[in-house]
A protein has these predicted regions:
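Glycine-rich segments within core transmembrane alpha-helices of 12-TM secondary carriers
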Residues: 146-167, 356-366
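Intracellular juxtamembrane helix-capping segments at the cytosolic ends
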Residues: 124-138, 330-344
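Helix-to-loop junctions at the C-terminal end of transmembrane segments
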Residues: 65-80, 277-289, 374
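Structural signature of the two symmetry-related core transmembrane helices
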Residues: 83-98, 292-307
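Multi-pass alpha-helical transporter architecture, strongest
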Residues: 10, 65-73, 193-204, 382-407
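A membrane-interface helix-boundary motif in multi-pass transporters
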Residues: 44-48, 167-192, 372-391
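Juxtamembrane intracellular "pre-TM" segments in multi-pass secondary transporters
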Residues: 2-10, 206-232
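Short amphipathic helix-loop junctions that connect adjacent transmembrane helices
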Residues: 25-48, 246-266
């Protein structure tokens, strides 16, 4: 698998995810959201609420923008050049860097505007990254390459997290270094980190163009090859995946009593096991078939989340959480490689626009249903059961599809 890195294009592709993964890791997941709620916002509860609204608004904007590209994009341009995606890459860098200028006393709404624009830009940049797989893959290596890239993404997130940890460790008691708050440096750091590892891919693919989406051609492609069943399956298991990410820290804290430092260590450990999972599954996917790889991951997650619902042991929770991390990376990477193999080259843009739309829809629907269940039952544990239900539903169209493909 690692011999693939001998190719400059593949190295650049993997390093691209290594770079941009710092954005969801540091801005959306670990540090910046808490800094905004505690410091910039007028009140922590208000800040947490506004942060959630901003991310929801960004997801809706992404969905609308991708819908426009999918449905109407072809009316405006027949081919999409690299410059289109490069523009959004610059936007992501600019608005992420700009977070440096917001501290206590700043307008609490303006940094959220920067978050929304950078988030939408990140999603478009991520669309480019997924699309690029079909341009750089080699014969019979799609599964290995997709998982290798996903592993690099995990690794980039962990590496950027480690750098911020070191800055915090060597800062003073007020978390300042060179008279600047470490948390203010997170935005510029993510921007520079993304640029440092991201520009290489644009350089090696500067002559590449992508066919503008044609929704009618995509529908024909999907129907003729039975891919609609896979997309239905993807919709359900992606709701489960998004819900796991959204509620993992709450499950850890309120059911199993993990402290904040333990939750942080758990998140790092899950990402580390995600790297292992991608490397293990990726090393055999092209022999077993991408569909088989996805099937194994769904089954593994279904069993683990069912056990999680019933378990009360602190140590069992750790084992389950790490194994969930093992499967949660490959299920996404193998889904991507399946689409790349089964969708015609001229329909890749349309397919991955739809793929990203599903992702944004799931980021709202999955957590909403889990949250609604928790509210109706007044139990976080009952909320967990929604996740294996999603996974079970994803197996129904998947089993019908299995007889048609072995890729």
């Amino acid at each position: 698998m690692f011999s693939l890195l001998n190719s400059k294009k593949i190295r650049s592709w993997c390093l691209f995810d290594f770079g941009i993964s710092s954005y969801p890791t540091l801005i959306l997941t670990f540090f910046y959201g808490a800094f905004y709620a505690k410091t910039i916002s007028s009140d922590p509860n208000v800040g947490t609420s506004l942060w959630g609204f901003a991310l929801s608004a960004a997801s809706i904007l992404c969905f609308l923008l991708l819908s426009f590209i999918l449905i109407s994009g072809r009316n405006f341009f027949r081919n999409i050049k690299i410059g289109f995606f490069k523009f959004f890459f610059y936007l992501m860098i600019f608005f992420t860097f700009g977070l440096f200028f917001f501290d206590k006393g700043s307008n609490q709404f303006l940094p959220l505007f920067f978050i929304v624009i950078s988030f939408v830009s990140f999603e478009i940049v991520n669309l480019f990254y997924n699309l690029s797989l079909c341009k750089i893959r080699k014969k019979n290596t799609t599964g290995a390459l997709s998982n290798l890239g996903w592993a690099f993404g995990y690794l980039g997130g962990l590496a950027s997290l480690f750098v911020v940890f070191m800055l915090l460790k060597f800062s003073n008691e007020s978390f300042t270094i060179f008279n600047i708050k470490v948390f203010l440096l997170i935005g510029p750091f993510v921007a520079i980190w993304s640029a440092l590892y991201g520009f290489s891919l644009f350089n090696v693919m500067k002559e590449v163009q992508f066919k503008s989406p044609n929704i009618l051609e995509l529908i024909k492609n999907v129907r003729s090859r039975g891919i609609s069943n896979f997309l239905i399956s993807y919709f359900f298991f992606n709701n489960a995946v998004v819900s796991i990410f959204a509620f993992a820290s709450m499950i850890a804290a309120f059911i199993f009593g993990l402290s904040e430092s333990e939750i942080l260590f758990l998140g790092v450990s899950i990402n580390f096991f995600g790297i292992i999972g991608c490397l293990v599954i990726g090393s055999v996917e092209d022999r077993m078939g991408s569909l088989n790889a996805v099937k194994i991951c769904i089954s593994g997650l279904l069993i683990l989340t069912l056990i999680l619902y019933f378990t009360e042991s602190y140590y069992s929770f750790w084992v389950i959480a790490l194994l969930v991390g093992f499967f949660i990376g490959p299920i996404q990477a193998s889904s991507r490689s399946f689409l790349v193999q089964k969708i015609k080259a001229q329909n890749q843009m349309a397919a991955f626009s739809l793929y990203s739309m599903f992702g944004n829809l799931c980021s709202i629907l999955g957590p909403f249903l889990v949250g609604l269940t928790i509210q109706l039952t007044d139990s976080i544990r009952f909320g967990i059961i929604v996740i294996p239900i999603f996974l079970f539903l994803s197996l129904i169209p998947f089993l019908k599809l299995y007889s048609k493909f072995n890729v």
